[in-house]
A protein has these predicted regions:
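Conserved donor-binding/catalytic core segment of Leloir-type glycosyltransferases
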Residues: 136-167, 175-181
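Short hydrophobic beta-strand element within catalytic cores of glycosyltransferases
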Residues: 246-249, 259
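Conserved acidic donor-binding segment of nucleotide-sugar-dependent glycosyltransferases
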Residues: 261-262, 266-273, 282-287
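Aromatic "clamp/platform" in nucleotide-sugar-dependent glycosyltransferases that forms part
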Residues: 229
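A short, well-ordered alpha-helix in the C-terminal region of glycosyltransferases
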Residues: 275, 282, 289-303
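Short alpha-helical donor nucleotide-sugar binding micro-motif in glycosyltransferases
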Residues: 208-209, 216-221
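Nucleotide-activated donor-binding/catalytic signature segment of Leloir-type glycosyltransferases, i.e.
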Residues: 188-209
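Glycosyltransferase donor-sugar binding loop
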Residues: 174-189, 207
Length: 326
């Protein structure tokens, strides 16, 4: 959503953004307050809709914006949203019905959420491709990159297990794990796992880095690991593809809708260290595989470039502000 906000500002749109708070309660309260206080200053609202506790705030905003007579678009987020909708179908259906438009960033969410509203529109997560320098990996080295928040659903502890399996045959293997600690104990469990399997010295964890530094961090590696147990269309994977990294990912959620196994990535079962290590071995030893994955990954990422996605957003916003549904 931050990238969209920057693009809208650059195009001359007057924006009010909420919320900068990380705490769920403070964040939700700030969004509701902003919707009321600035109701005379905005023509429409764009609201991210997540599952779990975060759904409550999207639901409350939908009721409030409807009462205020302000049109709004929902942007569906998170790989857990379909499971949440199956548990609370009437609630989700009622919430989505209030929106002028509902968009999904992936074919996965589009397909899974269609039973709850049948006119959901596909609007891919955009990427500023010019920020990512492409480097073809014809002879990839065991320099591994992991980019995600340290949270249980992303299964960061799997990564050091994979490194442990590779270290015997690839003594120079090294893993860089980039991302903030979300405070659920995953950071500590990952560290403990690395120590237990004897690879703590092969893993760097710089923590979270500013977004502008991510392209340079990705360029330093050759193989990207996506270890998640739940996913939609991860921007981190798109960023890795844009730089030409060879992607190895778990086959979960919306990932198979984004990646084609054997063409632009290698897909493995979730929480399977041996399968992920085997996929990495293939990339390191199988002639031509790394180059094919690298080249095709960049080509796939180009479909998500801002110049491709931006006209779709412009058309959508114009339709909403004209007061009719596309």
């Amino acid at each position: 959503m931050e990238d969209l906000a920057d693009r809208l500002r650059a195009a001359g749109y007057d924006l009010i953004c909420a919320s900068p708070y990380r705490s769920g309660l403070a964040r939700g309260a700030h969004m509701l307050t902003a919707a009321i206080l600035y109701r005379q200053r905005y023509d429409l609202a764009i609201v991210d809709l997540y599952s779990g506790k975060a759904f409550l705030w999207g639901e409350a905003l939908a009721v409030l914006l409807t009462a205020l007579g302000r049109p709004f678009a929902f942007v569906l987020r998170g790989g857990n949203l379909p499971d949440f909708a199956r548990r609370w179908p009437k609630r989700v259906r009622s919430c989505l019905a209030r929106a002028s438009v509902v968009t999904a960033p992936s074919g996965y969410l589009l397909e899974e959420m269609r039973p709850y509203r049948n006119d959901i529109q596909l609007m891919p997560n955009p990427l500023n491709l010019s920020a990512y320098r492409f480097r073809l990996r014809p002879h990839p080295q065991p320099r591994l990159i992991w980019l995600r928040a340290f949270h249980e659903i992303y299964n960061p502890s799997l990564a050091p297990k994979v490194v442990g399996l590779l270290a015997r045959d690839f003594p120079d293997v090294h893993l860089t794990m980039i991302g903030p600690d979300k405070g659920d104990g995953s950071w500590q469990r990952t560290e403990q796992t690395a120590v237990r399997v004897g690879v703590a010295g092969r893993i760097s964890r710089p923590g979270g880095v500013p977004k502008v530094q991510i392209p340079a961090c990705l360029e330093a590696g050759d193989i990207f690991l996506n270890t998640t147990n739940v996913d939609n269309t991860p921007v981190s994977v798109l960023e890795a593809m844009a730089t030409g990294l060879c992607v190895v990912s778990t086959r979960v959620g919306g990932v198979p809708y984004l990646l084609e196994d054997g063409q632009d990535a290698l897909l493995v079962p979730p929480d399977d260290a041996e399968a992920m290590a085997l996929a990495i071995r293939r990339i390191l030893t199988e002639p031509g595989l790394g180059e094919r994955l690298s080249r095709n990954a960049r080509a796939k990422a180009e479909r998500f470039n801002w110049p491709t996605v931006w006209p779709q957003w412009q058309a959508l916003l114009a339709e909403i502000t004209r007061g009719r549904q596309p």
